[in-house]
């Protein structure tokens, strides 16, 4: 990944950085004002952090973007597969109605300029998508529950339906999240992936010393992207494990649920 800001509070992807008509970012733990398990650059308001500190961090975030957004669209995620189209219905809604629309949403899609689609993670997989032909974008939260339920595949299919998106026009980025080496799971999680048709030898291992399964969420989501027809060269992986690099990125497995979140965002310029 590349640094967007000098203090490295915001990183970016090389593939997306080559397009001048969009902005994107992935936040780190550096350069903010939050404290404790939220230290220091937590921009997510639904994590238990002090509201004023989140607002100050969001101001710093927007100052680091190449264009100030009309809105940071940040859903209240629930590990489901619900998506929201940021279109006429959302744009005509009141602030309160928008908050209600964003509750229980784990994927956002739009072609509207100026609205920064954001996803909050702390070990789960953030996926950013850009359809360079139709000028459409998506931000997807793929925890293990979303991954096993094919949220990335389904979001791409919704983009196909809404915008005409096809695989050859997509650039997709898989962000900092828990790695195969760190993601130990129980039998019930392994069986859920197996039941839903995943290639288990490709996305999992069993550690001899513990007898425990480990799942590769990066590969499980990359396979969904490739299955949509996206060329492998247009899929970028950060390959950064949040559990290992918890000093740089938030990790719920390390810090607990009451902790900060990585914010990944993408926006079409006005």
Swiss-Prot record:
Temperature note: Optimum temperature is 52 degrees Celsius. Maintains more than 80% activity at 55 degrees Celsius.
Protein family (similarity comment): Belongs to the purine nucleoside phosphorylase YfiH/LACC1 family.
pH dependence: Optimum pH is 4.5-6.0. Maintains 80% activity at pH 4.0-7.5.
Any Pfam family matching the protein: Cu-oxidase_4
InterPro entries: Cu_polyphenol_OxRdtase, Cu_polyphenol_OxRdtase_sf, Cytotoxic_necrot_fac-like_cat
Cofactor requirements of the protein: Cu(2+); Zn(2+)
UniProt keyword Zinc, yes or no: yes
PANTHER family on file: PURINE NUCLEOSIDE PHOSPHORYLASE LACC1, UNCHARACTERIZED PROTEIN YFIH
Name of the featured protein: Purine nucleoside phosphorylase BT_4389
Subunit structure: Homodimer.
An MF annotation (GO) of this entry: S-methyl-5-thioadenosine phosphorylase activity
Swiss-Prot/TrEMBL catalytic activity: adenosine + phosphate = alpha-D-ribose 1-phosphate + adenine; S-methyl-5'-thioadenosine + phosphate = 5-(methylsulfanyl)-alpha-D-ribose 1-phosphate + adenine; inosine + phosphate = alpha-D-ribose 1-phosphate + hypoxanthine; adenosine + H2O + H(+) = inosine + NH4(+)
Record-listed E.C. numbers: 2.4.2.1, 3.5.4.4, 2.4.2.28
This protein's UniProt keywords: Copper, Hydrolase, Metal-binding, Oxidoreductase, Transferase, Zinc
Gene3D superfamilies xrefs: CNF1/YfiH-like putative cysteine hydrolases (3.60.140.10)
Described function: Purine nucleoside enzyme that catalyzes the phosphorolysis of adenosine and inosine nucleosides, yielding D-ribose 1-phosphate and the respective free bases, adenine and hypoxanthine. Also catalyzes the phosphorolysis of S-methyl-5'-thioadenosine into adenine and S-methyl-5-thio-alpha-D-ribose 1-phosphate. Also has adenosine deaminase activity.
Binding, Zn(2+): 79, 124, 141
